[in-house]
Amino acid sequence: MAKGEIVAGCLAPHPPHIVYAENPSQNEPVAEGGWEQLRWGYERLRESLKDVEYDAIVVLSPHWQTYIGTHFLGLENFQSLSVDPIFPNLFRYHYDMNVDVELATQIHDKAHEAGLAVKMMTNPDFRVDYGTITTGHMFRPEWDKPLVVISSNRSRAYYSVEVMQEMMTVSYTHLRAHETRI
């Protein structure tokens, strides 16, 4: 197994609006700018990494929600049109991304050895989520580095709306009772 090191990490905001505002050729809608603060942040990030050697970009996307295990993209290439379900008039992005399947498999296998439920996504028609695409584009608009894309497993924290409402009510009632005693 090849060994490497993590050379950088970041928490990357990824609303599709920032891709829209940049007007890349891959995105069908055209904007007149906007979202400068976030776009400038990504520009600074890219500048800070321009002399750093790295082989892949690892993205854990909160918008690729899985409920049975954590999934990893498991094919060398994914390409399609991604249309944001909430902002279809802002984000219609033609993506063509390469995946570091070897690294994804190594991470998958380590997670499996640790007892996590994991799966490799090998459906060639799988539509990659906009959070991954936005982060990939803003981080490296040339798309010349492969990605390792990891889903956000929601099974340990998924509640129905009714359960969440009940939890909020119980928490609020408990807080009010505590405040009354103080």
Language model regions located:
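A charged nuclease-like catalytic/ligand-binding cleft shared by nucleic-acid processing domains
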Residues: D96-E113, A117-Y130, K145-V148
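Glycine-rich phosphate- or other oxyanion-binding loops that anchor nucleotides, phosphorylated ligands
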Residues: M121-Y172
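Secondary-structure boundary elements
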Residues: E47-A56, D109-V118, P141-D144, A157-Y159, ...
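Single conserved hydrophobic/aromatic residue that forms the stacking wall/gate
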Residues: H174-I182
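Helix N-cap and loop-to-helix transition residues
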Residues: D100-V101, S160, T180
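Glycine-rich nucleotide phosphate-binding loop and flanking beta-alpha elements
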Residues: W64-T66, R156, R181
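Short, well-ordered beta-to-alpha junction loops that form the rim of enzyme active sites
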Residues: S61-W64, N123, R176
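A short aromatic-anchored loop/beta-hairpin motif
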Residues: A2-K110, A114
